[in-house]
């Protein structure tokens, strides 16, 4: 998207990494520094809105039951919509690099999404696996999958590899931001 004046930042992180906390703090920092319009977009929400407006689903849970080919079309359409938002502003896309499924890791950013979004930077919010496991166990407000510290470590390593593959397609940079316990403000400043 050569005529784009804005920027697309993709922000990812495992459940329990503190991605949302860091994102909220970063948005406040950008606002206080006088950046132009910054739009936060949840990729899954845009996909759901696309499917609902097409009459394919009534609620978000129905998304998983759509045929794979239709889901891919919705993914592409959502990515193009987000890319258009970034023509003249900063868009931060909140999504997951990989989703752990019973069949293995599912890419959150397949090639056709990366090509449409053409992100300027891909940001991975990480923490020590022990910190993530601890945060998940303390968070009673969310239904989180139970993963061992070793599985969390593998998941983060796989996300790094996936981020580099996405960066290769789009010519993006990749930044890893460590969000240690009690240090969200420092992570957001990065």
Label for each model-derived stretch:
Residues 11:
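Hydrophobic anchor at the beta1->P-loop junction of P-loop NTPases
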Residues 22:
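Hydrophobic positions on the alpha1 helix immediately C-terminal to the Walker A/P-loop
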Residues 19:
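Conserved lysine of the Walker
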Residues 28-39:
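Post-Walker A helix-loop "phosphate-sensing" segment adjacent to the P-loop in P-loop NTPases
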Residues 95-139:
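ATP-dependent NMP and nucleoside kinases share a basic, alpha-helical "lid"
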Residues 2-3, 141, 159-190:
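NTP-dependent small-molecule kinase module
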Residues 14:
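P-loop (Walker A) phosphate-binding loop of NTP-binding proteins
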Residues 39-107:
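ATP-dependent small-molecule kinase phosphotransfer cores
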